[in-house]
């Protein structure tokens, strides 16, 4: 299961993820990111404090959102990544690609 909430902070869409982002829940993620409030945002922070697991399909979903943000002259970055999820980010190289920040404030500042 994946719970997704969003709020705008200093012009940046902060998307909080809670649960698992995998082959089953990536459709939920993609559908939410396609909603007008989310899709119109070119600067996105994914708050991963509540994300307990991510699979390769979840990484792909994040990458697609990052590419979309970049095509709109924006960026997507991550924050508050748990040790288990961070390990996947480091091994896959996604941490370096997307950027991982300690907290929401640091992530928002990095892409503002």
Where does each model-flagged region fall?
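A charged, well-structured terminal subsegment
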Residues: 102-112
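Conserved catalytic submotifs in the C-terminal HATPase_c
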Residues: 9-10, 49, 81, 105
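Glycine-centered tight turns that cap/initiate beta-strands
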Residues: 11, 94-97, 103
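Amphipathic alpha-helical interaction surfaces in cytosolic regulatory modules
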Residues: 23-98
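General small-molecule cofactor/ligand-binding pocket signal
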Residues: 7, 79, 101
